[in-house]
Amino acid sequence: MVLRLSFMGTPDFSVPILQALLDAGHDIAAVYSQPPRPAGRRGLKLIPSPVQNLAKAKSIPVFTPQTLKTAEQQTKFTELAVDVAIVVAYGLLLPKTILETPRFGCFNAHASLLPRWRGAAPIQRAIMAGDKETGMTIMKMDEGLDTGPIALSCAIPITDNTTTNELAHKLSHIGADLMIEMLSALEKGQLKLTAQSGENITYASKIKKEETRIDWTKPAEFIHRYIRALSPFPGCWCNMNIAGREERVKILGSRLTTRPSLEIGRIEKGPDSLLIHCGQGCLEVTYLQRSGGKVLECATFLQGAHISAVF
C-alpha cells in the first residue's frame, strides 16, 4: 500500500524529515508551511521558510495560509485526499476538521519524550530544567496540546554542554528515521499506538523576553543551562561596561568552573579568558556577541573590548 501524504512544517528543524520522506519515495501531494516572513532592515523582502524552499526545489505544490480555520482552506485540504498528514514544527493550529480529514489521521514529530514537555519549546525547557535525557516522539494528533497516543519514541542523553542547536540537529534526524519507520508500520497494518501516561506531564511554554537576561545572582550552573538553552537564538544577554560605555552583549557559550564565587558580578580577565562570579560558583565565558556584531571567541572579543563590569 502506497500512502499519499501531505507535509506541514516550517523551520530548519522540519527539513530533514521532509527530505527523508522524499528519499524514501513517498507520494507527497502538497506541503504546507508558514507564510514568507519580512526580512532585511526595512522588512521589504519576503523570505520563504526552509521547508517551502525544499518543496519548491522538488516541484511539490506549496500552500502558505495564514490560518486553517476557514471553510475555504479546509475544503482545499480535503480535496488533496491524503492518507496521512505529517506535521513537524508547523506553527499553525490544526482544527478538528483538518485532523479528521486524512484517512489515517495526522502524525506529529515532537522533540521530547512525551508527556514531558508538551508545547512550543521542548528542547529549550529540557536543557533549562537540567534534564539528563530527552528524545523524539511520533504521536497521532488529537485536539489536545501534544496529548495524542504515541507511535514511536527514542531517547538521547543531554550532557552538561549540550546546546539547543546541537540537540535540535540530532533530534530532527532521529525524527526522520522514526517517521519512516512509523509509515512503514502503517503501510503494513502493523502500527501500534499507546496512550500517553498520566504522570510526568510538564509544559514547555514559549520563551519570554525577560528570560533571556542573565541574572548573575543565580548559581553558575543555572546560568550555564540558560545560555546553552538559548544559544544561538534568541541568546542570553547582560549589560557590560566596555570602555566606559554600557552595552548589551549576548553570551552564547560558557563553561562551568570549580572556582568559588567571591562577589556577584566580579570579573576576572586573562589574556584570552573571562571569568564571571555568580550567586554560587563562577562561569567562564567562551563566546560573546556585541549588538550588531559577529559571534566571537572570548580571546578575540577581549582584544577589542575593555570590560570593567557586568550587570
Curated annotation (Swiss-Prot):
Disulfide bonds: none
Reaction(s) catalysed by this chain's protein: L-methionyl-tRNA(fMet) + (6R)-10-formyltetrahydrofolate = N-formyl-L-methionyl-tRNA(fMet) + (6S)-5,6,7,8-tetrahydrofolate + H(+)
GO cellular component: cytosol
CDD domains for this protein: FMT_core_Met-tRNA-FMT_N (cd08646), Met_tRNA_FMT_C (cd08704)
GO molecular function: methionyl-tRNA formyltransferase activity
Residues given in the record as (6S)-5,6,7,8-tetrahydrofolate binding sites: 112-115
Pfam families hit by this protein: Formyl_trans_C, Formyl_trans_N
Keyword tags: Protein biosynthesis, Transferase
Signal peptide: none
Its EC number(s): 2.1.2.9
HAMAP family: Formyl_trans (MF_00182)
NCBIfam families: fmt (TIGR00460)
Function of the molecule: Attaches a formyl group to the free amino group of methionyl-tRNA(fMet). The formyl group appears to play a dual role in the initiator identity of N-formylmethionyl-tRNA by promoting its recognition by IF2 and preventing the misappropriation of this tRNA by the elongation apparatus.
Family as reported in the entry's similarity comment: Belongs to the Fmt family.
Name of this chain's protein: Methionyl-tRNA formyltransferase
